[in-house]
């Protein structure tokens, strides 16, 4: 195996995302980067550490609908945006459904979406319910369609 000492944590995250968040192993990531699994320890402490980093990356890349929309239009565009994120990240639907803690890196996105729904005319508690229903529907539909 060729030793690639120049890789970064970002390289490790991108390799894991390329493999798929539900399918990557430390060995597969190391092979893709041309390093040993032990070398990955310089950038990530465990598979869970890498999974959290992947989820944080995906969360940071989510494009929410523009502010100022009615709550109905916002939810429709949000559902489309979430579907696109799931399409771009194979296995993400499985991870978000199967791992109880996997939603945590997405909380700041959810808070921004909640604020937009309230600004669009929903009461706060209704906005939480609408987000929960929309996310559940998109996740389960995407998982079934895959």
Label each residue range with its predicted role.
Residues 16, 90-94, 111:
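Glycine-rich, often proline-containing surface loops adjacent to acidic residues and nearby aromatics
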Residues 1-28, 32-35, 56:
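Short, amphipathic alpha-helix enriched in basic
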Residues 63-105, 124, 131-134:
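Hydrophobic alpha-helical connector segments
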Residues 109-146:
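Hydrophobic alpha-helical bundle segments that form small-molecule/ligand-binding pockets
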Residues 44, 49-58, 100, 105, ...:
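Alpha-helical DNA-contacting segments of helix-turn-helix folds
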Residues 19-21, 34-51:
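HTH DNA-binding helix-turn interface
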Residues 11-19, 57, 61-64, 74, ...:
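Solvent-exposed, amphipathic alpha-helical segments
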């Amino acid at each position: 195996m060729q030793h690639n000492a120049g890789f970064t944590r970002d390289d490790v995250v991108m390799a894991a995302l390329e493999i798929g968040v539900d399918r990557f192993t430390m060995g597969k990531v190391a092979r893709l980067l041309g390093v040993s699994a032990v070398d990955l320890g310089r950038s990530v402490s465990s598979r869970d550490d890498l999974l959290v980093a992947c989820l944080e990356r995906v969360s940071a890349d989510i494009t929410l609908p523009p502010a100022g929309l009615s709550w109905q239009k916002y939810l429709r565009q949000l559902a489309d945006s979430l579907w696109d994120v799931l399409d771009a990240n194979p296995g993400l639907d499985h991870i978000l459904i199967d791992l109880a803690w996997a939603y945590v890196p997405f909380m700041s996105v959810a808070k921004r979406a909640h604020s937009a729904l309230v600004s669009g005319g929903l009461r706060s508690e209704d906005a939480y319910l609408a987000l929960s229903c929309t996310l559940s529907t998109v996740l389960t539909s995407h998982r079934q369609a895959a």
